[in-house]
Amino acid sequence: MLMPRYYPLFLDLSRAKCLVVGAGAVGRRKIGALLESGVRELVVLDPELSDPALLPEHTALVFKARRFTPEDLAGCALVFAASGSRETNAAVAAACAERGIFCNCADAPLEGTCIVPATARAGEMTLALSTGGASPAYARHLREALEGWLHEKMPLTTLLGRIRPRLLALEMDTLQNTDLLRALVQSELGTALAAKDAKHCHELLAAALPKGLHPWIAEFLDGLV
């Protein structure tokens, strides 16, 4: 069977209810990632979990030591079928499909409607990588290789994050803003930041930014050089 052509997407779960069916090693990884993402409510079902203390203590987490029923899907935006039972996971995925709820099925990705990419994070920057389900192990390998690269780019990401709101406040043409930010990305600014060359960074910004932002240059660079 051909793998789906997945649509990449980042989700804000701060107002969402999610469900994880199964609290084994795989399920606990899903639980940890969901809590880290700030999910509003996370229901975990597992009738066989011997020690609930294995789950993290969190106000958003609700654990129920029982089997899955379709009624558990009420209000859920995202569901993970991560039990050790093929039958249970298939039932969860099928029930989600009937209700149009996104479901990640750990042991049979094609039964679900979404997969979880390998992710690398550095500050506010997140890189998500997938092989389309062909080789999650290789995706993880690539993620590890890219983590160092991401950390090298953090100073420039932070700087651009400081500049952008001030730039937008000038109410210039959208295309002008885009061209200016792209020019900064393609300039020597990243190299100058990595070298902690404050003078060169200041010169590059003064040459590229509108005069209305020049008084902010020192603040933009604060702590980065």
Name each region found by the language model.
Residues 133-225:
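An accessory alpha-helical subdomain
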Residues 57-74:
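Glycine-rich, highly charged phosphate/nucleotide-binding loops
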Residues 78-85, 89-116:
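ADP-ribose/adenylate-binding Rossmann-like module
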Residues 25-26, 87, 133:
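Residue-level detector of alpha-helix initiation sites
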Residues 1-55:
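Hydrophobic, well-ordered beta-alpha structural blocks that scaffold small-molecule cofactor pockets
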Residues 17, 77-78:
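Structural motif
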Residues 46, 63-67, 107:
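Short loop/edge segments at beta-strand edges and connector loops
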Residues 56, 61, 92-96:
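A generic structural signal for well-ordered alpha-helical segments
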